[in-house]
């Protein structure tokens, strides 16, 4: 391992021990904000510190085994120990490199999930419903909370658009690679000839920002309309003009919220989604500029991004970004998404490591 990396790891290990000592200080325990901040830092440094301690121990083992090579009686055993220690050292070095990768500050945050029906009419709306159910099942398995912010139902089921807030540990970091185009190939229930149709939906995942970090929005840049919402088939969701539509004039971003009976609550929800959308648009623009020379696995939520194809007749799901195909569609639609999410997270880490090596 490079001396510069070892020096960085030593500094992080020392900081971990320093923070541990500070957390036992009565003055810091009394200051809850400081105590919480240090507790978070301690948790973030723990894996690096533990892994580095293991690596240091293995270096000692390598040194001891090399010294034993000079003893004819111990040589065979020393060679075996040396081989095992070097293998372990390589594994730990790879782990440490991943742990040193720059962290996305948004990864630990809650997220807004938007699913929109694209091309394909009623079938696209039905598939949007299937996708939302898939994500809800995944959230349920991870003990995350799903709160619907706004929805527009399809005429024959599913959704034209649905927005939900998902709350829990590391939601955005886990779901952020879902942003982009999702395509379905299947025989619609209304198809009498048994022909396979292709429909599409777009998914956008955005971090929920604390109030202090929301972009400054000039009230003069907003057009706010109130209306009475009604569900599919004319069923009234509510019977007062409490539904809110906010248009951000400079960007053209439109957010509707009609889930609550209170206009005030709908407006607050719509503004939080609007802030997240503006932030996401700014972030995507910045990332596009930064990553223009290498691929960006993080979809923009634009329909031109083709993330996955879900082929029902073949029971196949394909992630086009990493050329991964699995014949486990039923499990996928039931929310077993880790088998698709984990490979793309690993690919993203590999890209970051490659970029880091180029810089060095």
Swiss-Prot record:
From the UniProt entry, list the residue stretches annotated as the region Disordered: 285-313
Entry PTM: Methylated by PrmC. Methylation increases the termination efficiency of RF1.
Q: Which residues carry the post-translational modification N5-methylglutamine, per the record?
A: 235
Q: Which GO terms describe its molecular function?
A: translation release factor activity, codon specific
SMART domains, alphabetically?
Answer: PCRF (SM00937)
Protein keywords: Cytoplasm, Methylation, Protein biosynthesis
GO CC annotation: cytoplasm
Tell me the protein's name: Peptide chain release factor 1
What family, per the record? Belongs to the prokaryotic/mitochondrial release factor family.
Q: What is the role of the protein in this entry? A: Peptide chain release factor 1 directs the termination of translation in response to the peptide chain termination codons UAG and UAA.
Location within or outside the cell: Cytoplasm
Q: Which Gene3D superfamilies match?
A: 3.30.160.20, 3.30.70.1660, 6.10.140.1950
- InterPro entries hit by this protein: PCRF, Pep_chain_release_fac_I, Pep_chain_release_fac_I_sf, Prokaryotic/Mito_RF, RF-1
Q: What is its main location?
A: cytoplasm
Alphabetized Pfam families for the sequence: PCRF, RF-1
């Amino acid at each position: 391992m490079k001396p510069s990396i070892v020096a960085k790891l030593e500094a992080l290990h020392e900081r971990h021990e320093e923070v541990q000592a500070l957390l036992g200080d009565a003055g810091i325990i009394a200051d809850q904000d400081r105590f919480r901040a240090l507790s978070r830092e301690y948790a973030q440094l723990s894996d690096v510190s533990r892994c580095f301690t293991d690596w240091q121990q293995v270096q000692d083992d390598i040194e001891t085994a090399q010294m034993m090579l000079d003893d004819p009686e111990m040589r065979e055993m020393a060679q075996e120990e040396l081989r095992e220690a070097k293998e372990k050292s390589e594994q730990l070095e790879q782990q440490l490199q991943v742990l040193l990768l720059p962290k996305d500050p948004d990864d630990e945050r809650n997220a807004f999930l938007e699913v929109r029906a694209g091309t394909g009419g009623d079938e696209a709306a039905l598939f949007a419903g299937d996708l939302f159910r898939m994500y809800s099942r995944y959230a349920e398995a991870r003990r995350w909370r799903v709160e619907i912010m706004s929805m527009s139902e399809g005429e024959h089921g599913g959704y034209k658009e649905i927005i939900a807030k998902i709350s829990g540990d590391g939601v955005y970091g886990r779901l952020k690679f879902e942003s982009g185009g999702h395509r379905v190939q299947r025989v619609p229930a209304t198809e009498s000839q048994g022909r396979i149709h292709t429909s599409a939906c777009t998914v956008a995942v955005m971090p929920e920002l604390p109030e202090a970090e929301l972009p400054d929005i000039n009230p003069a840049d907003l057009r706010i309309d109130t209306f009475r919402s009604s569900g599919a088939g004319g069923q009234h969701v509510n019977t007062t003009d409490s539904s809110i539509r906010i248009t951000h004039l400079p960007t053209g971003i439109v957010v509707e919220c009609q889930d609550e009976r209170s206009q005030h609550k709908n407006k607050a929800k719509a503004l939080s989604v609007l802030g997240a959308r503006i932030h996401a648009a700014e972030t995507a623009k910045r990332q596009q500029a930064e990553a223009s020379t290498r691929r960006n696995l993080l979809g923009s939520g634009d329909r031109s991004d083709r993330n996955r194809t879900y082929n029902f007749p073949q029971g196949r799901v394909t992630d086009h970004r990493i050329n991964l195909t699995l014949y486990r569609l039923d499990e996928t639609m039931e929310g077993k998404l880790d088998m698709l999410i984990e490979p793309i997270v690993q690919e993203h880490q590999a890209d970051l490591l490659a970029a880091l090596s180029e810089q060095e």
